[in-house]
Amino acid sequence: MSSAEDGELDPQIQIELENLNSATDEINKLEIELEEANSTFRILLNESTRRLKVSSKKLGNCIEKARPYYEALDKAREAQIECQKAAVKFQRANEIHAAAKETVALAEQRFMSNSHEWQFDNAWQEMLNHATQKVMDAETQKADCHAEHQRLTKLFNAAEQKLQQLEDRFRRSINKSRPYFEEKQVCQDQLQTQKNRIQELQQQVAGAKSTYSTALRNLERISEDIHRQRGDFPTPPGPREPGVGAELNSPTSSALPSLPDFQLELEKCDYPSIAGSQMSLGAKTPQAAAETEDEEDACDYDETGAGELRGVVDERDLEALRQKVKILAVRPIEGGDGQQQNDVWEHELKATVDKLDHLMMLKETAKRQQTNRLKSTEQRPDSLGAEALKRHCDVVEVKVTSCATTASLPVTPHHQLNHLAPPTPIKKLQQQLAPLPSVNVSMRELPLLARLSNELLDRSSAAFGGVRKTLRRRSLE
């Protein structure tokens, strides 16, 4: 091998080596950005699901009541967009039809004005036939577009009517759950934007790897040509395997975990008690039924203290934080060659999300305190005298019942259990609402029972006569 042959190298080798090195750097940079974009997507998904679960737990059954309205709202928007597209198509078809008719009219007018000079030959006949065919096609297209526009208009009107009916029926639930669905829409937009960014990075990585494999194959081809010209080694039999990094199915792309379906994850947040719904209806206790009724009635309360809530948490601060989270979520990662400020960016995003959650928790706490104050005001008795009089009547009733039972009434196991264990508030309420128990008493014992009850009432009234007068005076005042 001479020195002249060593110096005569193909200049394409240097070009392919530069392409190979640049493709390697591009692959490394894009893979780092892709990994960070995936982690950002998962952070956003976790934070979005957590915020939506908190809001869903707070609103309760109002989300279920308002869901048909927002689904109908989406369908109405889609129908409106389709109707607008059909209107544009009909307008274009109408313009094409008018232009075709004008072309035929001008051709006929031009021929009639020069009929003494021109002859109606086959060329004129073919031109008029072609223009007439265009008019007929445009008229058919116009009729089809008009029918399609009418059909979509009817669908849009039906969707609007259904939307109005649902709004009139569930107005309170819709107004109360509006922040939840707006927050859900913001989360969906953020996650969709981040997912589009991930897909774009994946395509860029695939393109960079394709460039890398092309440069590597070119280098292999140049190497084979050089060895064939020199005749140093015989050509190995069989096809040559691809080099490192030139595989068609790259292990790097398959090693990355697939993105979860964020639509499904966000839909799960709408059902906070999905585990409890698996219980049978027959196993539902009265307390659970009462809690369900309270939850259904909770979405119909009147928000009279909206000014106090605005004093605790400003809505403008919440909106500013939401916009900041949205900007941080879709902000591209700056820098290259794997030198990104990942820690600073993640810390800023996490701090903003924590601050937003803190303000939302303050708002939720203020709402709960206001609701508790309203409930306590509704459950408060009219006057102190009425409460004391009711307590005194309960004491007299208990004494009369105990004495009468000791005197003549038979003691059943149910009555004996009630006397041994003090009644709970729920049982006490049931005893007040339930009818009196039926007792088998003979006609001979009725005068004795009447005399005993009259004596007990006289004693109790004599003992608490002064207290009754005072309480009565207070209640009247």
Curated annotation (Swiss-Prot):
Molecular function (Gene Ontology), one example: protein kinase inhibitor activity
Residue positions where Phosphoserine is found in the record: 113, 115
Organism annotation: Drosophila melanogaster
Segments of skewed composition (Acidic residues): 291-305
Record keywords, A-Z: Coiled coil, Phosphoprotein, SH3-binding
Classification of source organism: Eukaryota, Metazoa, Ecdysozoa, Arthropoda, Hexapoda
GO biological process terms on file: anterior/posterior pattern specification; female germline ring canal formation; intracellular signal transduction; mesoderm development; muscle cell fate specification; muscle organ development; muscle organ morphogenesis
GO CC field: cytoplasm; cytoplasmic side of Golgi membrane; plasma membrane
Annotated stretches, region: Disordered: 224-258, 276-306
Gene: pcs
Keyword Phosphoprotein: yes
Signal peptide: none
Protein name: SH3 domain-binding protein 5 homolog
Family label: Belongs to the SH3BP5 family.
Coiled coil: 12-95, 122-221
